């Protein structure tokens, strides 16, 4: 409250009311003086000297707020001081009001909370406080957090006695500038050698940008575009390892430290400090602090104290007991009865014994190893034989022709006796363990559905899968992929009305529910095995082209392509685009087979721009485009029958073959396919091979003819050699 306003109020009661109103708003109560106790002399307005603000400034000091009793008695103290303090005040040194210091509490700025320093841990290194102040004030990182990882046992990979600091940068540029400035400050001030992982130096950034531009030019010349989810320039995360600083090492008792020490070498004195600098998005994405906190909690539960050495216990032998010569017959029989029975978990169980052979009982070797339960052991042996015979049955079924294999599978799910294969299969199934029997039954149903057996339905397969997971049986990744292939199995029928060119929605729903259940059981579904299967399932299974819905019935099949509605075609494209975004965001590694499947889908849908983009991404992924890729490419264009596309592909891809690392040269198989494309693009190639044709096509045509003739000559020589060897007399 302004002093001018207080001095302007001449009445003592008015001043008290004004002061009481402001003080009551701050939560402090003042007891007003009794009216009857005020004498006429005291009721007279006091002399307004310069000491008036000095007496009343105590009401707004920190003491009045901290102790309400002092503020409550302020009026009585002032009234008592008025009687005898005037001579004393005159004797004191006069201090004008404009020279007196005021205690003002400044309101905290909202951004102040982001710049608060974290509390120091126990026994911190001397440099830690200065380090935190520099990170917060000079380079401007927000939301600082400090984790004390010195108690971790075993220590983390960054090193023992670790203290980790987290900070948020305001942008990627601020992140790089802050890390560079921080490292330079550590080098110049403390002569440290920090290691900043993820920081690009000024010259290194220029080099990377120059290389990226050069790579983009090379890719553009190859007929593709540069598309990479991560260019390696902006990561949003820089880890600065300050190094080992003096002090801050937690002390441990000598005896306990020697007992728990394993290894060799000297213990390094000091504390390692690591500063994690991240942008706000990257910090929320990886949530590194939560991971380290979980590690600390687990470490505190696992190691409440230093471990104490324990005496070595004898090994526990499952299924057999080993006794020494000092064990009596009664004790021996008791030990046998108390031995746990054999568990049929279908794994090979081993045990070792540390007792010496000379201490064994020499009176008889029959008591050295005694089976605990003969019935369980016999059942386990039968189960093992069943496990060996079931794969042989599936191997026999896979070697049959599709029609004969369908006959061996009988009438359907309920048929168990119509064929010898089913009889033997279910006999072996009854001998094996429940979890293996359930998995083998699922395998049989998948095989039947993939063979397009009409008696086995996908709904029954999914129901059997639900029973398998409800029983809490193991769900290996190979079994999930096998069931997924069966649910996504589909054969297009262009002659039906309307044409069946895509997987039905009900089958797709079952497949998605399968993937969801597998993810809940811990299977990694962000993998090429799952994503590419779904990508192919939502796509068309034959060559199509889009027309308007009104022209769908009148549109004809052109160029081996079937007309489809443009609305459905765009819906398929949207789903494919979302799946492609997931693949790029999750950085899913694709292989040769996956890229060939994607190329075929884009070719079937007539999306040539996406086709050549995917062709260029193969080289960017580090996959060699060898003979298999070019066989697929030229075969695809030969099947399409489009002479314009074939001509463009020949002119662009034949030089590309010779620029591959290693180059792809013509052999008889590849030359045959390229010859078909040349004959399609240039029908009169034989007559006009020397006239008005590009030199590249003429040269390629001669190479193909030469490769095919050489192959025929080699085959003729082999037949002659075989004929001569067949006529030679046997030794």
From Swiss-Prot:
Function: Probable mitochondrial mRNA stabilization factor.
Membrane topology: Peripheral membrane protein
Region feature Disordered, mapped onto this chain: 68-93
Family: Belongs to the ATP25 family.
Boundaries of the annotated transit peptide in chain numbering: 1-29
Statement: the UniProt record of this protein carries the keyword Mitochondrion: yes
Compartment(s): Mitochondrion inner membrane
Gene3D superfamilies the UniProt entry points to: Beta Polymerase, domain 2
Keyword terms: Membrane, Mitochondrion, Mitochondrion inner membrane, Transit peptide
GO biological process entries: mitochondrial gene expression; mRNA stabilization
InterPro entries xrefs: Atp25, NT_sf
Protein name per Swiss-Prot or TrEMBL: ATPase synthesis protein 25, mitochondrial
Keyword DNA damage part of the UniProt annotation: no
Compositionally biased residues, Polar residues: 76-90
Spans through the membrane: none
GO cellular component terms, semicolon-separated: mitochondrial inner membrane
Matching PANTHER family: ATPASE SYNTHESIS PROTEIN 25, MITOCHONDRIAL
